[in-house]
Regions:
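Terminal low-complexity/charged segments
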Residues: 1-159
Length: 159
């Protein structure tokens, strides 16, 4: 049995009405929740004894604008690069995608329980925005700035 299974069960019990998607891969749990629930869930993940994710390791943004597209258009032929190994006769998007374009992904570490957790929320507003977690983890300051600079995702409440 994986070491992450007991944590998976505790997360599922605690956030049964909040979790939209839950997976486990390579002994690391990934949760997807709505952006509206972010601060409530993060506070519980940080403070509750069953979780104790006191360390925010990283925040990144994923741009799903071309997710599932197996080929990109070019204006000229090339003997090198990705496109020469792809069959262009098929459909353009090989994986259907019906979610928002940008996701903000938080990576946490519980030193007490020696567990890692990935939490994903989609920025559904336009322009893309989610709540800032800087009040819970001051280290979020630079991660949120970088996400804004690179992707334009706005973190509401960021100083």
């Amino acid at each position: 049995m994986s070491a992450s299974v007991p944590l998976l069960q505790k997360l599922n019990q605690r956030f049964v009405d909040v979790i939209q998607e839950m997976t486990i891969a390579l002994d690391e749990i990934s949760l997807e929740i709505s952006a509206e629930q972010l601060l409530e869930v993060c506070l519980a993940l940080r403070d509750e004894a069953d979780f104790k994710f006191e360390l925010l390791v990283d925040i990144c943004v994923v741009d799903y604008s071309d997710y599932g597209v197996s080929e990109w258009e070019t204006n000229r032929a090339s003997l090198t690069g990705f496109e020469r190994g792809v069959d262009n006769s098929g459909e353009q998007r090989s994986i259907p995608w019906h979610k928002p374009r940008f996701a903000v992904v938080y990576h946490f570490l519980s030193l007490v329980h020696n567990q890692r957790l990935r939490l994903r929320v989609f920025a559904t507003a336009e322009p893309p925005q989610v709540l800032s977690v800087i009040t819970l983890w001051p280290a979020a300051n630079w991660y949120e700035r970088e996400a804004f600079d690179l992707y334009g995702v706005f973190f509401v409440g960021h100083p």
